[in-house]
Amino acid sequence: MQWIDEGLVIGLRKHGETGVVLELMTLEHGRHLGLVHGGRSRRMQPMLQPGNTLRATWRARLDGALGSYAVEPLTLNASRLMDSGLALYGIGHLSTLLRLLPERDPHPALYEAAQVLIAHLDEPEIAPALMVRFELALLAGLGFGLDLSHCAATGANDALVYVSPKSGRAVSASAGEPFRDRLLALPPFLRDRDQPGSGWRTPDAHDVREGFTLTGYFLDQHVWRPRAQDTPEERARFVALGTGQR
């Protein structure tokens, strides 16, 4: 068995005296592990840092085996990001999120979204909002996507300012007003589909905090609580730095 793909490094662990088990989020083969012989050498260590993108050749005798990787660099982001606390916590949180995906289950759209996020993790003006959007995409990839396209009560697609914590569907201002204390806020940047260059506005810290509150609620309900886990520390630190909460 053999394939060649590109992959984002999301983790590694020691194996034997000189090797590592490398965990990649690949474009076409999903989250995939493999043994890298000599992965702990001085030559290999800089390449195998989380956040880097590699060209990987995976080989195994059987499809279900761990197999081994031969890797070469494509984009080495780790050295660029290591000077930013926001980026370091962002890489840690992104890796934790991607590990929620079933192993070897392809998610090419999530892979591409992760690459966009990695490219901007050291830009505090946009990285937090991109992370909120990635969390929404991950929820959808896990089968817990939110419907923010129209009001759950009226079917209208304007003045959407709330999300129902029960259904995960958007609610308009008028329909939600009597129940506003029981609804989650839907910040403008999550309901606006405009892209940079066509009237897009960078969300402020308040909007981003509301976005993280929204995604955090559903991640807790559907992901962390069923696994008896707390909110990852990397997420808490990233949110604090990204929204001006020291």
From Swiss-Prot:
Cited Pfam families: RecO_C, RecO_N
Gene3D superfamilies reported in the protein's UniProt record: Nucleic acid-binding proteins, Recombination protein O, C-terminal domain
Record-linked InterPro entries: ARFGAP/RecO, DNA_rep/recomb_RecO_N, NA-bd_OB-fold, RecO, RecO_C
Record keyword DNA repair present: yes
Coiled-coil intervals, chain numbering: none
Keyword entries, A-Z: DNA damage, DNA recombination, DNA repair
Keyword Nuclease among UniProt keywords: no
Gene Ontology cellular component annotations, sorted alphabetically: bacterial nucleoid
HAMAP family with a match to the protein in the record: RecO
Biological function: Involved in DNA repair and RecF pathway recombination.
Family designation: Belongs to the RecO family.
Protein name: DNA repair protein RecO
Source organism of this protein record: Methylorubrum populi (strain ATCC BAA-705 / NCIMB 13946 / BJ001)
Gene from which the chain derives: recO
